[in-house]
Amino acid sequence: MTKCAASSRLALSAVLRNVFHSQSSKLGASITPYRRPFASVPLFSSDIQLQRSFGSMPRLCDSQNEQPEPAVPGTLTVADDTLPSQHKTTKRKDYDSSGKTDGWNTHKRQPKDHGGNPENRTGRTDRERRAFRNETRREAKKEPRKWQDRTEKVKLFSENKGNKKPEHWQVQKAALKEKFAGGWNPPKKLSPDALDGIRHLHAKAPEQFTTAVLAQEFEVSPEAIRRILKSKWRPSEDEMESRRKRWENRHDRIWSRMAELGLRPSTNRTRTLSDFHVLYDDNNRKRR
């Protein structure tokens, strides 16, 4: 199939080529210093050999005449410079550290070895692993822990202790503690003469010397006065003498301590009971 020579001259590529040729001859002098300021060779030099042909529209060129036309170096140079930058960009390639193409895509991730987890070694799926973990947690919640056992035991013991009926002595002790703050065993000790005096006063005038009056007079609890009056025990002659001697020695010890503090005068009777006489003799020599 033959084509008309006139129609080939009117093709778009031929028209553009002629326009570029005419414009480049007029603007060549003004374009050269701005386009290529660092070039040592003139732009329209005949020595420049371009290695690629004008191909702004390859599809239109293929449809035209297959006979090659003489290429003008200046025209192609200007056309190459005026092309948009998007036609000059080349496809970037990914390189890995060894220089292979698409190096990042060729590496495959190796699955991590979960050696410490027994669930992964059995080849179970994610659903089976979740079910196994949930079942293990439910079983752990069912088993009571040690601190829970201790708490339950203490709770049961306290409940049993509260329900247990108190003994007779516990009832009496609670009643005495509620009635008398000092209790039935007062810290203050009464001498044998004081005990005899309490009994004598209450026997002579019971209406005048009541329990409350005697408790206030001797500075003891009413329960102590009641027990003294209720008691029927009477010591023998020997027991009375022994109690009297012990009470006198107690009095002398207290007097000696007060004398050392300067609160009581020192006497010959109490001087032998002082701490100084225990550590040193009469000649102020230390005892061995």
Swiss-Prot record:
Q: Does the keyword Lipid biosynthesis apply?
A: no
Where is composition skewed (Basic and acidic residues) in this entry? 112-168
> What are the UniProt keywords, alphabetically?
Mitochondrion, Transit peptide
Q: Where in the cell is it found?
A: Mitochondrion
Region listing for Disordered, in residue ranges: 58-168
Q: Which InterPro entries match?
A: NGRN/Rrg9 (IPR010487)
Query: Quick check: keyword Transit peptide in the entry?
Result: yes
Question: Transit peptide positions?
Answer: 1-54
| CC terms in the record's Gene Ontology section | mitochondrion; nucleus
Describe the task this protein carries out.
Required for respiratory activity and maintenance and expression of the mitochondrial genome.
What family is it from? Belongs to the RRG9 family.
Record protein name field: Required for respiratory growth protein 9, mitochondrial
